[in-house]
């Protein structure tokens, strides 16, 4: 069975997304498993979600929104709460923080690249392909440095272990093996449809897109970087969707290799208890699909 489930790591838990919605499982301080499910409204599965590129923008918005809510839920449960105390303000703040982070990540490489090029007056004018390539290198360098730095934090290492458990459980399902900790643990912590690969693909896409839109004005470059974030996300989504449908292709496997390597920074080997949480979340998402 080729089931296309995805998900993300939560604080002491895992979120799995299916066709009908998302199911989160979080282990509380007392060891009990706390669940939360969120169905995808029928309107979000309408005709707009079939339009290439646009569907990627909509999917990214849903992913960020739902992921933020579930992350807040997991934080509350992990702290000993019930997961029901999230306020609308807290949810909006989490989503806003993600939007601000994406904007800063689009702008900062441009500023750094501009500073580097000003030190080399023999270079061609700012903007265009040269500027975009330099930005792309800076952007990827920032990402790798950031992931490498936070991966040394103990709490983040646990989060990354749940990330690995999520990948292992989905790989086991796709391989049609029993969903038990023993069977799941034999799989790799990396997965070709991982969100980490989406980040890397977005950076590659942004380098290509920004390369065709040159501007001598620093403000113009910054404005276009922010304005084109949805387009970059939509194109990146389509590329990953294509790759997911052609995983048996040697070319696609080669293209996926950098993303698989990058996951060595964002995943860790999980314990059996962490794998149990991932399996529970996956089974919950499967049950939602069966009821839909």
Tell where the protein language model's regions lie, with residue ranges.
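Divalent-cation
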Residues: 1-79, 130, 134, 152, ...
